[in-house]
A protein has these predicted regions:
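Rossmann-like NAD(P) dinucleotide-binding subdomain of oxidoreductase/dehydrogenase enzymes
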Residues: 69-187
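Glycine-rich loop-to-alpha-helix module at the N-terminal edge of alpha/beta enzyme cores
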Residues: 1-68
Length: 187
């Protein structure tokens, strides 16, 4: 797990995610073919899934540009007149993301994108039956400039490890998309 001393700076995260969104758009057909063959769905549905993924990452980029922190006027009493408070957003720590099978590209994008945008490394556990999209996402993020250790993929059939990570005190956030059965196993 990373420490606060080696988080990625905001400008670098924006640049990486912007490149990643562009890569998704540029490789739209290739990614849709992967999602279609992996998930057994029609190609037009997979194209929509890929487009939504690119839009989701671009939304993360725009949110980062607009929301880096706040300056809050403090005039609640005479002693605080003319003073302001500054807030700065900081990463909460590593994110563990467990995802479902039905939209393997889009669901993982909507977990990984916000985690990286927030400055948090992410450990992803894809569905056992649809891991290829997750591996492709991790590969593309590294190609876009994300350090390799920032997006780790747990191999299929490692739900026991994911369950252990849920209770690991070093994990800052847990994201789960999936069935109630798996949710109960993870809790």
């Amino acid at each position: 797990f990373r420490t606060r001393d080696n988080w990625l700076p905001l400008a670098e995260r924006i640049e990486i995610l912007h490149r990643f969104a562009s890569m998704i758009t540029d490789r739209r057909e290739e990614l849709a073919m992967l999602a279609a063959s992996e998930g057994g769905k029609p190609l037009p549905d997979s194209l929509v899934e890929i487009d939504r993924g690119a839009d989701g990452i671009q939304c993360c980029v725009e949110t980062l540009r607009a929301d880096a922190g706040y300056v809050v006027p403090m005039g609640l009493n005479a002693a605080s007149q003319g003073r302001v408070a500054f807030t700065q957003k900081e990463p909460i720590g590593p994110v563990v993301a467990v995802s479902a099978f039905n939209h393997p590209f889009n669901l993982i994008i909507h977990q990984v994108g916000p985690a990286v945008a927030a400055g948090c490394p992410v450990i992803v556990k894809p569905a056992d039956v649809t891991p290829l999209s997750c591996f492709k996402i991790a590969e593309m993020l590294v190609e876009a400039g994300l350090p390799p250790e920032w997006c780790q993929v747990l191999m299929p059939e490692t739900l026991d490890l994911a369950t252990k990570l849920v209770t690991d005190g070093r994990v800052g956030f847990f994201s789960f998309i999936g069935s109630a059965r798996v949710g109960w196993m993870l809790r």
